[in-house]
């Protein structure tokens, strides 16, 4: 009679390493992106495809992507080996950003990533796929806007230490290795040139592999898992949309890791409940008795899950012309003053005085009816574009906000 416990996978046995006996792959095999097979005497232990497991257990929300470099192709190629040496973390002083308000408008909307990304990816597809992408101009305009905005996130993070899903005050004092490495990798990537491109890509590859091999999503604390997922999202944005074939192939191979980590974080993250016709914002779940530190963790988690979902959705749409139906049961706090607060005092004041706009995406219209144009920040605008289109969003925001978020071009003549 076979034993009731699961045996270690063959790879871990051969390497004499401890196996966590996970399905469809153990954590070690998943991190190394290799086949994971249990003893064939027990058929029910045999490897299943990672893609099937992820699709059955995880679904995320929607689009993201942007403008990168040229010469991309979509065939997978083996990952370039990286140096076995452990790169030192950046000095803690690297995290000493001033407590200035998060000022997204100060980031120039230049061609940080080359604008040929869409044409480059689309032209690699079969004719039927290309037709599917270009036939729905409404979806195409929304995805392109989200892609162009979200792809500059690594640059924003390197310059300000904060993005629409990473809050500076949550990690600045802790200086976690995952985000510390991501910050240095993003900063180095912003300095990429023809001469140093190989070094920049090797550094990025090393940081990514180091991150994936160091995190067990089942054992990591919620904060460690959050920071690891945030770092991985940054690496994926760069790799998917830079235009380098090797980076893109590796990012596609790492997508199951992203989805697995997101699934684990989802299980630990409370979401807001739908309004149920209640007009008092205090009645929304999670509103009462909240301290700033806890709020930063929970809100960062919700925003990170939405951003990871956008990354998956936009890239799938750009590459394939469609995306699977996303799980819209996500929520976040859309109030810009709350997310951009850099001190507990300013956050508490805004928490009491401002409309908090705790939005469940599936109930967008009920909550957004209470908002003004200047209440929204980048994530809220992106979600609104994905739900309502660039034209409707631009009309709701008004001229000054259109300029602020780069919607003026999309608004005139777009959908």
UniProtKB/Swiss-Prot annotation:
Residues 72-88 have a biased composition (Polar residues). InterPro entries: Zn2-C6_fun-type_DNA-bd_sf, Zn2Cys6_DnaBD. The keyword Ribosomal protein does not apply. It comes from the Eukaryota. GO terms for molecular function: DNA binding; DNA-binding transcription factor activity, RNA polymerase II-specific; zinc ion binding. GO terms for cellular component: nucleus. Griseofulvin is a spirocyclic fungal natural product used in treatment of fungal dermatophytes. Residues 9-36 bind DNA. Residues 65-91 are annotated as: Disordered. The keyword Protein biosynthesis does not apply. Transcription factor that regulates expression of the gene cluster that mediates the biosynthesis of Griseofulvin, an important antifungal drug that has been in use for a long time for treating dermatophyte infections. This is Transcription factor gsfR2. It comes from Penicillium aethiopicum. The lineage of its organism: Eukaryota, Fungi, Dikarya, Ascomycota, Pezizomycotina.
